[in-house]
Amino acid sequence: ITGLDGKYYLMFALDMEGSCRLGLASTSDFATFKFLGIVSGEDNRNGVLFPEKINGKYLRMDRPNRVQKEGGPLSSSSIWLSESDDLIEWRGRSALIEGRFHYWDEFIGSGPPPVKTHEGWLHIYHGVATHFQSSNIYQAGVMLLGLDDPSRVIGRCRGNILEPRE
């Protein structure tokens, strides 16, 4: 859920037959919602909007699903950045960060909307370690993106900031 332009926008995964797309809805009161449409043209999930326009464009991070592990769902190991004039049609997609093989964040995806700080956009993302004998362990990490150019990764935590212990 992202507050933007006086409304709240919800970007969500639409599980469809054989694939997953990103859907977008808006609300101003959380009692009624308006479905705005399907906003991804390919198998995709973990979409999150930036809470303000940057250089006159709406920005979103998402995770195209391109990898299928044996017996598992289609997933991916990268977070992408794209831009839009209207929140519906998206273009200019490019990889922002990649998962790290045999590390806590082999498969990754965005978390909540990024937070604007004086140093840049702080973004929490999730990672999945898949190399623990088929026991997927979800963890959280953090990265900092350029304030005026979020395609620039200023820093990314080497270790996780949150993980389950039991």
List the predicted regions and their residue ranges.
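Beta-rich carbohydrate-recognition and catalytic domains
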Residues: T2-V48, E52-E106, V115-E166
